[in-house]
């Protein structure tokens, strides 16, 4: 150690002690004890046979003990007990798959049977159960085994072990039953000894103990002290303090203004990402829950170690949950990224980049081309993109100044970025690529102070993030959660990375024009930068170190992305900041100073054109509501050639021009005129032209959608309206028909029961409807199979519309079960379905009276089922005289919104019908003799409509599917606390494609809320429509009705206890 080092002995001592202690406390944080909130579900409550609801978010209890006196089974016998079969169950007996997933103690014929997850554990004849010998039935369930016994009874003489106590046991599998409450068919006072006690898994409902709090505070303070000491050691080099921010940091140029304008406008009209509703709902519910649970999957386990960013969003949501407000941090990150690119990255790349306008414009175009389609939401990609840039800037400052405090800052930022989300793994590259220069600095400085005083603060900085991650959780809990997520999935391997690129080349929002171009342009810029660096050792005019590190970070980030457990294209959003930096590198690389050959520049232009052509071989599609009204969202228009073909042909022409330059015009003539100079400069920046063209295309597309759809709802309109105080989004535009019977039109001269087929009804009959009309899947041909899961439960928005039969015939003798709560006693129905020989069917209804237009709603609706073409069902209108003479004035086709053959509502705006019309009738022709082709109709009606906001309101607990959360900011997601979910009253689903794709994510296999609600509640679709966009499939509203309507929320026995960081009550069942 030198003499100068001896003068800093206090700083050295502080750096060593504070750094090592800070790191030790940070690493000890996961293992320190926490205060756990405990909860016990005990039943009976109120001393009566009263069913209670207690849907466990983790599905099962850590331990369950049940004791039932044998005398209690007497309530299941006798003529007065008809229909009463369940003595006790943890799931309603009416629920699909109740026997497969729950515990039921029930009467089966003349036996009392205890069944757990479809496995009979023990049973006894009712005669023996009610005999004096039988004392009680006991049951215990733990993760390793379940046991049940009829105390007092023994196996009979014909059994394998006669005289042995009548008991059963199952092990070798986690048989713990799912619990959504305690239900019984019995009533009245309870017998003595009846007891149900479940220990609810609340391992994640915890808070730090005083010891852990003190340790965390000391860990943070000591880390700060260590960093101050490291700064003092850095100052020993004798150099003066350098500005933290460049001198022109706050100045705004024309390009800055343009980028700010685009980002600000896109903030309002731009498309969002698919997971925004997922993340927003988690954030909204976390405060009441006490931790950031993964609300839609994985049995309520916490998001940690990736949840700290979502905690910030939870705080942000205290002001308002509107989209425009919740994404303000994202906008701030976008602006910060651009400021770093333009003021830190480009100047550090060297004089050629700093002096080149093409470099700045290309950097801006590349940055926007990636940011706009991938980062305009609540996902963590924006903060990861920013974190990567900040880490690189800190590393570059360390290399430039030969100081180590920036290294420590880079470690903190890198760790925060790493734990912002699974894709934060890309931040590792920012540190790895600079290991060589940083080790050189450390080696040089250690000669002066020794290695330990320099390394200890960096170690503390690298580990301090553990305090944030494990502040209220334990090592055991997080380890169990990570193992469960890996087991449940999705958990793809590194060699499955090809799936991400396969999705990128699908004609879907995942592989849309914008996303595909963003990634391909990034790869082109990276390829050019790598090629030039390999060919000449460096890109001429650029600083070798910083430019190589930018390239290295990008390459390592692509490699690191291989290890993320999911493979979605929105993960490419982490490259937004790097894309801008690479854009600057590529612009300099292809400039005339670096790439003098016109042939080579022309070939590069052809490559860029090919990338554009490949990008447009897709759709201009966006996720869910962001796609409303967007032009070419399904396909691009074709004139003589498709746009992709035209771009490909242009690519060939440019390649032929390059061949001309190679074989004929081999000299590089210089431009002689000012116009020629400008043309030459433009040709030298093809990637800038392409990126800015795509940016303009994207912004114009979403702006056109907002203007073209007006006054109908769009994302842009909703965000702009939020500035005026209209903050409820789509809930104010979805119109709900609560009572479809109230809007039914009356026939002019025929009884209601006969009017539907009074003019003509050939092969249309009251029972011409199959019993099952479940919808076909979106992705399968019509009629291939019904859109139901293997367990028989629908997953889309048509719950309650899949048909069935009634025991009592309706007004016209039909036994068909009608949708949307249509009353069969008031609503006739006719259908053309028939088994056996098929014949042509025709229907002409009687005339129905139209009400006065000023007293009618905006829409005319007919509930229909079947598979048919639009032209096969029509509405004819007439005046009174025209109807009397049988001369209709004209006809209209309906908009058929929904999935066939399920019941859905055919729609026709009332404004389309001439004002002179006073009567209407239905006309249907089924001339297709295919057995799966049929039509069923109910009478026309004009719905009485209220907004979804008025119907659902602010307070009712709602099951918001994860795609819809951002579009419905005023609806309250159902809460969970102490391991128990609140029972929702409504469910809001996305459009049919989204419902089919995403409902499986939330089902019982993944540990989501759908696996709870389908056992506890019956879903019925409520008719709804999107205002002024009547033919739009916006989604669906479902009313959730408990199978046991009188069941009340259970009262839990709460407590608090202290748990070690290694405590584990039981494995998480999955």
Curated annotation (Swiss-Prot):
Entry's localization field: Cell membrane
Gene3D superfamilies (UniProt xref): 3.40.190.160, arabinofuranosyltransferase like domain (2.60.120.610), EmbC, C-terminal domain, subdomain 2 (2.60.120.940)
Keyword list, A-Z: Cell membrane, Cell wall biogenesis/degradation, Glycosyltransferase, Membrane, Transferase, Transmembrane, Transmembrane helix
GO BP terms in the entry: Actinobacterium-type cell wall biogenesis; cell wall organization
Entries under InterPro entries matching the protein: Arabino_trans_C, Arabino_trans_C_2, Arabino_trans_central, Arabino_trans_N, EmbABC_dom1
EC primary class: transferase
Pfam family, one: Arabinose_trans
Chief place of localization: membrane
Segments crossing the lipid bilayer: 10-32, 210-232, 247-269, 399-421, 425-442, 449-471, 512-534, 547-564, 574-596, 603-625, 645-664, 685-707
Membrane topology designation: Multi-pass membrane protein
Keyword DNA damage: no
Family: Belongs to the emb family.
Function: Arabinosyl transferase responsible for the polymerization of arabinose into the arabinan of arabinogalactan.
Name the UniProt record assigns to this protein: Probable arabinosyltransferase C
Organism of provenance: Mycobacterium leprae (strain TN)
Gene name tied to this protein: embC
